Amino acid sequence: MSIEVIRSGLNTTFQDRGRSNFYHLGIPFSGAMDTRNLLITNKLVGNDRNDAVIEFAMQGPKLKIKQNNINCVVTGNVNFTFKKNSKIFNGECYKTFDLNNNDEIDIISTNNSMYGYFSISGGFKLEKKWNSYSTHLRS
């Protein structure tokens, strides 16, 4: 699976449920800010409950898909569009949709909330560090 980042968005990171049992080593818990939406996001696309998702604050990324038939979902209170075959559609949160090679998703902004989530069926191919996919920006 390959995704081209056109715009990174604000505070866009990969997150899961976080890491536990490492704080005594100085490694913070980290993890998604909204665990409920993280779990819903993974459930809607058929992923494991602790698979990584893309978490974003206020403005999300703009991404170009580089593979056919990818099932996606955006959760939270989010304004987003997706472009399929040069036509732009308004997205609906908590509803899955398929994207194909060269289709784009533009996560414009969150509405009355800080965070939103995006994931794909099958998850992202990432390497775990300290038993988690979560990003801790201050580390």
Can you describe what each PLM-predicted range is?
Residues 1-139:
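Conserved "landmark" site that anchors the functional core of diverse proteins
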